[in-house]
């Protein structure tokens, strides 16, 4: 098989993973999502956002203390040319600004950077952010293993720990 045209990836143990690569290929066929990246003040979160930009899947709006962000980028060799940067005083401020941008519809998605989850969740759930609905907040993530042929989409492993039946109904509605 020609590796340059394959959508498969070999893992260290020789297994093949395909699901996430197929998902990424599908997403690349769509218009990029305008995504606020909240406080990407470490090389990992900033690099992930820039990788997604290079893949053509997002248009990042970086919200962080600008001086700190530029220092992280310089240290990691990351080029911020063409990125929209919104200066924020600190991580809490970045979360509040990002939530307001999402609430106003100026971005389509949020990506957590190097701030604590509770900081971001507090800003998202603040009444003035405009993001609350009548249903519970839920989340999901994609996980792939070598021993199963498709990726798993796992919801509420951390936010709704022991949901009631009514809360489970909201989780399912949100997932659909």
What are these regions (language model features)?
Residues 2-61, 65-176:
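Anion-binding alpha/beta catalytic cores of soluble intermediary-metabolism enzymes, centered on
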